[in-house]
Amino acid sequence: MSGFSLSDLESIVAERSKAPPEQSWTAKLVAGGQPKAAKKLGEEAIEAVMAAVTGDRDNLTYEAADVLYHLLVVLKIAEIPLENVMAELERRTAQSGLKEKASRQSS
């Protein structure tokens, strides 16, 4: 297993977002704003779902990487650090998923 993490990818996204858009796909997405980045995230998510449904493990791995990358771009544009998402995941894992869902529905 590699030592590469989502935090590493977040740092790469942050660095590449500073480049001129004609030199970096990340910078181009960021320059296009949230609508463009979110649309691309949605496209990649659909491709991942299709790979999952068809049982294409190799393509699912590839598309999952695209989803994670594009999610980090969307978070970058929204100025939401990955740390915030991880804190929310940690909060949610402190209780069962069914209890967490029920608490959202009663709010």
Swiss-Prot record:
It holds the Pfam family PRA-PH. One of its GO terms (cellular component) is cytoplasm. It comes from the Bacteria. Its EC number is 3.6.1.31. One of its GO terms (biological process) is L-histidine biosynthetic process. It catalyses: 1-(5-phospho-beta-D-ribosyl)-ATP + H2O = 1-(5-phospho-beta-D-ribosyl)-5'-AMP + diphosphate + H(+). It is found in: Cytoplasm. InterPro entries: HisE, PRib-ATP_PPHydrolase-like. It is an enzyme of class 3 (hydrolase). Pathway: Amino-acid biosynthesis; L-histidine biosynthesis; L-histidine from 5-phospho-alpha-D-ribose 1-diphosphate: step 2/9. GO terms for molecular function: ATP binding; phosphoribosyl-ATP diphosphatase activity. Its main location: cytoplasm. Keywords: Amino-acid biosynthesis, ATP-binding, Cytoplasm, Histidine biosynthesis, Hydrolase, Nucleotide-binding. NCBIfam families: histidine_hisI (TIGR03188), PRK00400.1-3 (NF001611), PRK00400.1-5 (NF001613). Belongs to the PRA-PH family. This is Phosphoribosyl-ATP pyrophosphatase. The gene is hisE.
